[in-house]
Amino acid sequence: MTDIINKLQAFADANPQSIAVRHTTDELTYQQLMDESSKLAHRLQGSKKPMILFGHMSPYMIVGMIGAIKAGCGYVPVDTSIPEDRIKMIINKVQPEFVFNTTDESFESLEGEVFTIEDIKTSQDPVIFDSQIKDNDTVYTIFTSGSTGEPKGVQIEYASLVQFTEWMLELNKSGNKQQWLNQAPFSFDLSVMAIYPCLASGGTLNLVDKNMINKPKLLNEMLTATPINIWVSTPSFMEMCLLLPTLNEEQYGSLNEFFFCGEILPHRAAKALVSRFPSATIYNTYGPTEATVAVTSIQITQEILDQYPTLPVGVERLGARLSTTDDGELVIEGQSVSLGYLKNDQKTAEVFNFDDGIRTYHTGDKAKFENGQWFIQGRIDFQIKLNGYRMELEEIETQLRQSEFVKEAIVVPVYKNDKVIHLIGAIVPTTEVTDNAEMTKNIKNDLKSRLPEYMIPRKFEWMEQLPLTSNGKIDRKKIAEVING
């Protein structure tokens, strides 16, 4: 596959009435997707700046993506869940010529001409448009959090997206014309893992509404109505869905492939999923936004579960060469690496290198290569110092999750005068806690055999489930706010 747009157009010509995108009762056929995106591309033609794509899970968000790719300008997805001040920061950074608003509400942009769905539906522009995008053009820019509070716009080139899509289709064992589930909002690059492999293989992209993120029963209704074949989500979202006893192979026999990315996949969660879907293909993948979604993969089997108490993220893919610094920081090199941060030379220079035409990115993740597999050991910036000891919070969390009394765990440092004074564990227990002191004692006894005393949390807070962000990741900030009152 050398071009995604040509692939989509060929499928639309052969299967015009096949459903390309579905969100609740809203659907678009492949013919509609290609026609509407061409009409949008005519309006964007000649623009040298990325289009702001505003909305949530409307099928017209996909129209916006394909239209912006055809026009060659690329797009910046902005989800409705993003705070207004952050949206203003993004628009100020992008300085767009055009904004495509896919919501029913008005969108006040300080920059750029605003289009609506109705504008495109009623447009008399031609439904044929020859794609203008080139391999080295920026296809999308996704903004991630910055340490200073200013979001950073990660620019991904078209050739990187095409290469990633080809890799995903090589991993995919379910074949073409499958029903794909996408959990992630489009401002989160995990969505790319579902969108382009799905459409490039003639599948139907089923979009999970934001109301389903913390309500698995609503998702159950969706899965009952639509027999999904391929599931793409964060591990945290899948864990929440496993609260449904009906989420199993007997109930959902069509669901035969899972892709996870965006977070570390806990061993306990993977074990539960393998037990419930013994015939399914389950992939654990890893990659930062700055390296086109994912750069490693491993198929999780019972053999892998038995061999590794902490799951590896697998082996590198084409377009990504992995290595570590003397400090254990993971470095990614190759085609998968981003073009840098939009209009932010200082931050780009801190973590990217483009010498001799080779792109490298310092991830900030601690990693090791062992037994032919890569392992992610947490964030370097999740290191803290307590009583003179430097430690990794994620190492403590990993050990907590191996306790028979713990289903899920997050460790929160408690500060006083900018200094960590002790640790608290936010715990989802495997059983109801009837005796707080007894449960605390049991968990601490488990930890004492695996961690030094200074790394064991002083106390534990019990939670029914860990809160998730709009991206479906564990919301560490909210947990810290709850614990610290």
Curated annotation (Swiss-Prot):
It is found in: Cytoplasm. ATP binds at T144, S145, N284, T285, Y286, G287, P288, T289, D365, K473. GO terms for cellular component: cytoplasm. Pathway: Cell wall biogenesis; lipoteichoic acid biosynthesis. Its main location: cytoplasm. One of its GO terms (biological process) is lipoteichoic acid biosynthetic process. One of its GO terms (molecular function) is D-alanine [D-alanyl carrier protein] ligase activity. Its EC number is 6.2.1.54. Belongs to the ATP-dependent AMP-binding enzyme family. DltA subfamily. Catalyzes the first step in the D-alanylation of lipoteichoic acid (LTA), the activation of D-alanine and its transfer onto the D-alanyl carrier protein (Dcp) DltC. In an ATP-dependent two-step reaction, forms a high energy D-alanyl-AMP intermediate, followed by transfer of the D-alanyl residue as a thiol ester to the phosphopantheinyl prosthetic group of the Dcp. D-alanylation of LTA plays an important role in modulating the properties of the cell wall in Gram-positive bacteria, influencing the net charge of the cell wall. HAMAP family: DltA. This is D-alanine--D-alanyl carrier protein ligase. It comes from Staphylococcus aureus (strain Mu50 / ATCC 700699).
